[in-house]
Regions:
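Conserved segment of the helicase C-terminal RecA-like domain
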Residues: 348, 352-362, 367-408
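Motif I (Walker A/P-loop) of helicase-class P-loop NTPases
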Residues: 39-48, 135-140
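SF2 helicase catalytic motif II
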Residues: 104, 112-153
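Non-catalytic terminal extensions of ATP-dependent helicases
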Residues: 310, 329-333, 412-766
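Conserved interdomain linker/interface between the two RecA-like ATPase lobes of SF2 helicase motors
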Residues: 144, 151-153, 158-263, 310, ...
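Conserved pre-motif I regulatory segment
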Residues: 1-32
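Conserved nucleic-acid-binding Ia/Ib motif block in the N-terminal RecA-like helicase ATPase lobe
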Residues: 55-100, 104-107, 167
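Conserved C-terminal RecA-like helicase domain
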Residues: 58-60, 67-68, 75-77, 81-84, ...
């Protein structure tokens, strides 16, 4: 096929032409390229190609915000040919092009394969999320359970082992998967390093640090700590002087993004009077439309935006985030403080990117950034067709990273993509009910972790075989064809134990006593053991081996064989473990589900049937259902219980608790808390109920205004809206899973109480 070098007025790069050629040839494809290089253009070409036929295509993304953005983009181009399905949002679910989160696609592939039987292509955006500790399993299961007829377009940031990823996908779907790896950026990056209030090239930083290492690299350097408080001002001022704005300033804390944005706006001003008037009108319109007059966040953000400064993170209301995105895209904002989700969820590059720190909290502990994370965020620097160079400002903070660690992070190799496969109870139940035992074994062998482990299997197999041969070679062979060597060795070990015991006691006497007493005790010990020893010597003569001149040689060879046998057992165990990594985990979870009454030898019991349809806290939801809480509680109480199931308390983000309000919780909610928390003490995989925020849901469900809700808590507005929308998702899961019409109708009412006003208005924004 002859291809034009332009698509939608864009001149295609060579890697894009290669990718489109592979698509036209009907191949699946792994496309690895730097952030901002134009991978999405290939996906858009594929969607347009499929929409010209009667086939269907599914586009998956890692986060709802990105799904919503893609839905808005594609629906503007293709109208009602596009739909979206993200759990809490369902629009035109049977559309020819369906935009979904990866979790939704995985659920369809496992539970309702008929729904995707006519899908010809699936696009996996950000497939490197497969290496995410919390969510990576979803990507693997999505690929494993996809129809064999489907073709994949897997888009990834730069990863070194994309060939290995492609070979694994190829082994799962049984057809060829091509690889295109493009490492050249459309706009090259240049790194600057912040140190001692100035920006340096790397070679100059090296001289500076080595010249004053003793002065500046102490772990508790007070000067560094004070410098950190004003780091953002120094960086912004110098980039402004060098005409390197707009700037995306990345921080790993929402609270810090809020603080730095407001501080900067109160000390710096980047906008003209005309820009201020326009920004003010846009913000006022947003505040009026969504009734945000009394929200401190909205008023502070207005002050910041009017001076050309902003912030963007998940704690902001989606309506305010959208306003920030519009102003940044129009180049009205010069400095934007963002968290790392901006690098994934929003395709908005800038001339410069800066980091406030290089350590992050990952939900478990503080750790240095990984090279892949650093590369993806840094990739937001440099706008194609606008900038000749993208600038990345990296702080040198010795208490966080040594100079060598800093050098490796910026200039070192990116980590390989590693599998994080871990079966959920939902997956175990669906495997158990839908497949025979041997089929399950085969499925469990198809994950990426097993594929990576299989690389070692030939080496392990060879090692085991060599050890077996070596044991056979050294094992004693009696030239006299005597048959009592095994019995003799049991006797020999008993004799050795007695002699060892005697030796230890003699040693204790020698080191513990001196003079005449020592000699007396020594004589007593010798007498104590002499009789036993004489008896053993007599027994030794009864063995043919005991009288043989080859005895010492046979004993030596036997001991050598025993040592080799220990090695063999170790490597054989490792080989068995590597050969079926997931089967033991699957069997342990099956046994637990059997004890809990979810399965029997025939299949799923009623509890298992329900849990197999729930993807959020499935065991807790199932137990609440079978103990009558969804039936007996009011709609408002059901909503509050669901919120307590899904809410994740964030560090330093507020807990939402009002002691008096929490104490007034309805008895049914207190009862549910006691019930689930009792289960959680028995089973660590069950999360205790977070009831400190239940009063917020009850008030909202009963019709309170959002401003009144926010006056009751310190939880960020965006977090609370997102939690409410997650409850909507969970309620829909439960409604689809239960059979009683009366309960289904009740859950529909629950949804209506939540999905109103500002929560409804965020449906396609968050």
């Amino acid at each position: 096929m002859e291809l034009n070098v332009k698509y939608r007025d864009y001149i295609l790069d060579e890697f894009q032409i290669q990718a489109i050629t592979e698509i036209e040839n009907g191949h699946s494809l792994v496309l690895s390229a730097p952030t901002g290089s134009g991978k999405t253009l290939v996906a858009e070409y594929l969607i347009e190609k499929v929409l010209k036929t009667d086939q269907r295509i599914i586009y998956t993304s890692p986060i709802k915000a990105l799904s919503n953005q893609k839905y808005r983009d594609f629906s503007r181009l293709y109208g009602d040919k596009v739909g979206i399905l993200t759990g809490d949002v369902v629009i035109n679910r049977d559309a020819q092009a369906l935009i979904v989160t990866t979790e939704v696609y995985r659920n369809m592939a496992i539970e309702d394969p008929e729904a995707i039987a006519d899908v010809s292509y699936v696009i996996f955006d950000e497939i490197h999320y497969l290496g995410d500790i919390e969510r990576g399993t979803v990507w693997e299961e999505s690929i494993i359970f996809s129809p064999k007829t489907v073709r994949f377009l897997a888009l990834s940031a730069t990863i070194p082992n994309c060939d290995e990823l492609a070979r694994w996908i190829e082994s799962v779907i049984d057809h060829q998967v091509k690889v295109i790896s493009h490492n050249q950026r459309a706009v090259p990056l240049s790194f600057l390093f912040y140190h001692n209030k100035s920006l340096y090239q790397f070679k100059d930083l090296r001289k500076k640090v080595r010249g004053g290492a003793a002065d500046h690299e102490g772990p508790r350097d007070r000067r560094q700590k004070k410098e950190g408080e004003f780091r953002h001002f120094d960086i912004i001022k110098q980039l402004k002087q060098q005409d390197r704005l707009p700037l995306l300033y990345f921080v790993f804390s929402r609270a810090l993004a809020d603080k730095l944005s407001l501080d900067t706006a109160r000390k710096m001003d980047f906008t003209s009077p005309a820009e201020k008037d326009r920004i003010e009108a846009m913000v006022d319109n947003c505040i009026e439309k969504y009734q945000l007059h009394n929200l401190e966040t909205a008023q502070n953000l207005k002050e910041e935006l009017m001076r050309g400064v902003g912030r963007h993170h998940a704690g902001l209301l989606p309506q305010l985030k959208e306003l920030v995105e519009i102003l940044f895209a129009e180049r009205t904002l010069r400095v934007l403080f963002v968290t790392e989700t901006f690098a994934v969820g929003v395709n908005m590059p800038a001339r410069s990117v800066a980091y406030d720190a290089l350590k992050k909290y990952d939900g478990r502990s503080f750790r240095p950034m990984r090279a892949l994370e650093f590369t993806q965020i840094s990739g937001r620097a440099g706008r194609r067709g606008i900038d000749k160079t993208g600038w990345v400002v990296v702080p040198h903070i010795p208490r966080d990273l040594s100079f060598e660690e800093l050098q490796n992070l910026v200039y070192g190799d990116i980590e390989n993509l590693e599998s994080q496969f871990d079966l959920s109870f939902n997956s175990v139940l669906n495997l158990y009910s839908g497949h025979k035992t041997e089929e399950v074994r085969l499925i469990l062998k198809r994950n990426f972790a097993q594929f990576q482990a299989n690389k070692n299997l030939p080496e392990l197999t060879e090692k085991v075989a060599k050890l077996r041969l070596e044991i056979e070679r050294v094992a004693p062979r009696c030239p006299e064809k005597k048959n009592d060597f095994a019995d003799f060795m049991k006797f020999y070990k008993k004799k050795q134990q007695l002699e060892d015991t005697m030796h230890r006691q003699m040693l204790d006497i020698r080191t513990g006593m001196r003079g005449r007493k020592n000699r007396i005790f020594q004589a007593e010990v010798e007498k104590k053991f002499s009789d036993s020893h004489a008896e053993l010597r007599e027994q030794e003569k009864t063995f043919i081996c005991g009288r043989c001149h080859n005895l010492n040689r046979c004993i030596s060879r036997h001991q050598q064989a025993e040592r080799l046998e220990k090695k063999l057992n170790y490597w054989r165990g490792l080989l068995e473990e590597q050969g079926e990594l997931q089967l033991p985990l699957y069997e342990r979870k099956l046994e637990l589900l059997r004890r809990l009454g979810y399965i029997d030898e025939k299949g799923l019991l009623p509890r298992g049937e329900l849990a197999s349809r729930i993807h959020t806290e499935e065991i807790a939801v199932t137990e609440l259902y079978f103990h009558g809480y969804f039936h007996e509680c009011s709609e408002h109480e059901v909503n509050a219980i669901c919120l307590s199931l899904i809410y994740e308390h964030r560090r330093r983000a507020g807990n939402g608790e009002q002691p008096r309000a929490a104490a007034k919780l309805p008895e049914k909610i207190k009862s549910a808390r006691g019930f689930i928390n009792s289960l959680a003490r028995q089973h660590p995989f069950i999360k205790p109920l977070e009831t400190r925020i239940c009063h917020l849901m009850i008030a909202w469900s009963e019709g309170a205004a959002f401003e009144d809700i926010m006056s009751m808590t310190d939880i960020p507005e965006g977090d609370l809206i997102r939690a409410f929308r997650q409850v909507i998702d969970l309620l829909r899961q439960i409604r689809d899973a239960v059979k009683e019409m009366s309960l289904r109708d009740k859950l529909l009412s629950c949804l209506a109480y939540i999905n109103r006003d500002i929560v409804l208005a965020t449906e396609l924004r968050d």
